[in-house]
Amino acid sequence: MELRDRHVVIVGGTKGIGAATARLAAAAGARVTLTGRSRTSLDAALAGLPQSVVGELLDFTEPALVAVFAGRIAAPDHLVLSASSAVAWGAFAELAEAALERAFAAKFWGYWRVIQALAGQLPASGSITLVTGAAARAALPGTAGL
C-alpha cells in the first residue's frame, strides 16, 4: 500500500498499536492525523512523532464531537480505529453492567460513529482498519476484556 502523500487518520493513536501505526505511516510519507481523548496523552504521543503529524482531541463516545471532528479534518485516504476501551476487564461474571455498557459504547458505537462520519469521504482506493487487542485472538483464563 502506497502511503506517500496519503492522509491517514488514526483514532486512538496516542499509545500502543495506534502510536506505532502513526510512526510507521509518517515514516512512509503519509500525512497523519491522530486522535486522543486527553491533551496530556496527545501531547506525549506527538512529542515522539515527526512534527508533520497532527494531533486532534476526540472523545468518540460523543456524537456531536465526532461530527465536528469529521467536518474539521481533511478527507482521509485511510482510517485506522485503534482506541482502547479498557474500562471493562476482569472475570466476566463479576463485571459491572455499567462498565460493560461504557466499554461497548466506546469500542462498538464509538467506532461506528467515526466510520459513519468519515466513510463517505474515503476514496475508492481507501481503507478502514479496525484494530482489536490480543483478547480477540486468545482468551486469558478467568477474564473478559472489552
What are these regions (language model features)?
Residues 11, 76-85, 130:
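Rossmann-fold scaffold of SDR-type NAD(P)-dependent oxidoreductases
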Residues 84-101:
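Conserved mid-core segment of classical short-chain dehydrogenase/reductases
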Residues 61-74:
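Conserved Rossmann-fold cofactor-binding substructure of NAD(P)-dependent oxidoreductases
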Residues 99-104, 108, 112-113, 127-146:
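Catalytic loop of short-chain dehydrogenase/reductase
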Residues 80, 110, 114-118:
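Hydrophobic positions on the long internal alpha-helix
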